[in-house]
From Swiss-Prot:
Residues the entry annotates as binding Zn(2+): C73, C76, C89, C92
Protein name: Hydrogenase maturation factor HybF
InterPro entries: HybF (IPR039002), Hydgase_Ni_incorp_HypA/HybF_CS (IPR020538), HypA/HybF (IPR000688)
One Gene Ontology MF term: nickel cation binding
Source domain of life: Bacteria
Disulfide bonds: none
Lineage, uppermost ranks: Bacteria, Pseudomonadati, Pseudomonadota, Gammaproteobacteria, Enterobacterales
Assigned keywords, A-Z: Metal-binding, Nickel, Zinc
Pfam families in UniProt: HypA
GO biological process, one term: protein modification process
Length: 113
C-alpha cells in the first residue's frame, strides 16, 4: 500500500509549511492526485489520518482533487489528456504515449489557524 508513504510525505510537507507560515493548527488540506497515480481514494483518506496523527494537521479535513493525466503522442506530436494507463491518443488513436503529468500526488494548499 503506497498510499501510506505518499501520505507520510504529504504530512511532512504540511508540517513544514505550517511551521513556515506560523499555523498552529491545520484545518483543511487539498491534495491533487493524478489520474495515473494508482491510489485508492478511501485508502488515501485512511492513511492520511494515520500520517497526520499527533501533528498540527490531526483531525483536519482532507479534500482530494483528481486531475487528468497529460501525455505526449509520439505519432502525431500533440499533447493529450488521458485518464488511464492504457489510453489512446484522442487525436490519432495511437497507443504510443509518454506520460508527462498526472502520475503523482501534490499538496495543493492548506488552511489553518
Amino acid at each position: 500500500m503506497h498510499e501510506l508513504s505518499l501520505c507520510m510525505s504529504a504530512a511532512d510537507i504540511i508540517r513544514e509549511q505550517a511551521e513556515q507560515h506560523g499555523i498552529a493548527r491545520v484545518t483543511d488540506v487539498w491534495l491533487e492526485v493524478g489520474a495515473l497515480a494508482d491510489v485508492e481514494e478511501s485508502a488515501l483518506h485512511f492513511c492520511f489520518d494515520i500520517a497526520c496523527r499527533d501533528t498540527v494537521a490531526q483531525g483536519c479535513t482532507l479534500h482530494i482533487d483528481v486531475i487528468p493525466a497529460q501525455a505526449w503522442c509520439w505519432d502525431c506530436s500533440r499533447e493529450a489528456e488521458i485518464m488511464q494507463h492504457a489510453g489512446c491518443c484522442p487525436h490519432c488513436g495511437s497507443e504510443r504515449l509518454r506520460i508527462t503529468e498526472g502520475d503523482d500526488l501534490r499538496v495543493k494548499s492548506l488552511e489553518g489557524e
